[in-house]
Amino acid sequence: MKNCWLQNKTVLITGGASGIGAGIARLLITKYACKVIAVIIDDTGLEQTVRELGENSGNFTCLYYDVSRYENWIKIKKYLEDNSVQVDILINNAGIFPAFGRFENVAKDELENCLNIDFYSVAYSIQVMYPHIGKSDTPAFVTISSSAALAPIAGTAPYTAAKSASKALTECFAFEHPEIYVGCVCPGFTKTNLFSRQKEDISKNKLISAFMSKRDRMVKKIVHGIKRKKCRMIYGADARLMGFLFKFFPKSFPRFFRWIMKISKQPMFEDVFIK
């Protein structure tokens, strides 16, 4: 463990109060003695995260900012430097998943909100934080994208577009800076509150839940991948399968998946098929 490059690092993570972000924060703190600074917009899930950290909660702090605003990243950078905090690793994890529906029916505000949080927050943070993190002995940038970036799914146009863009941006940034570690994660469906905007409570849907990975299992895979400095991380059987099928069957797979969604009669997919 002493030789692990993650040991005793200072990590800045967006969306670290709950879900995958909170899980990553907890594992980095408890296993690698990291100090984690979570950038969050509200306290949703925070109490449980602090409780799970227990005596290690002293290594977990929060900054309250809307990460989709460029000027807030300027403020975050200034706060860190004014307080002599050197961040080693930036993990872009914040994200929202709008309800399934046809693209032409997506409200302008909802479209902009999804793009701002799922894509622009990644772009802004990397641009602003690069000069600061570049001063670290072990600078690293990690983006939590999605399996949606591997294969398009009917009803997810804003989310898929934003996550695909964040994946592409991260990989381009990696090619521009081979001297630092840049990783991109494409996790499959995971049991978190990401799906809170859907028409039904996914946690109570046994059919959908059966295809979802447990959060802590997904977190362990992600952190292990970061530990090994993997550039592209695709985790979850559904993510690997989606990527494979779309790669070799780019026309028939999306149609087949749409057909499965339709015959499943799941409430969360209803708006995809309403003309």
Where in the sequence are the language-model features?
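Residue(s) in the substrate-gating loop at a strand-loop-helix junction
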Residues: S146
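SDR active-site lid
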Residues: A174-A237
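Substrate-binding pocket helix/loop in short-chain dehydrogenase/reductase
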Residues: G101-F103, A107-E112
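Conserved glycine-rich cofactor-binding loop
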Residues: A17-G19
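The beta1-alpha1 cofactor-binding region of Rossmann-like NAD(H)/NADP(H)-dependent oxidoreductases
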Residues: Y64-K75, K108
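Active-site helix of classical SDR
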Residues: I126, A162
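Conserved glycine-rich Rossmann-like NAD(P)H-binding loop of the short-chain dehydrogenase/reductase
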Residues: A33-Q48
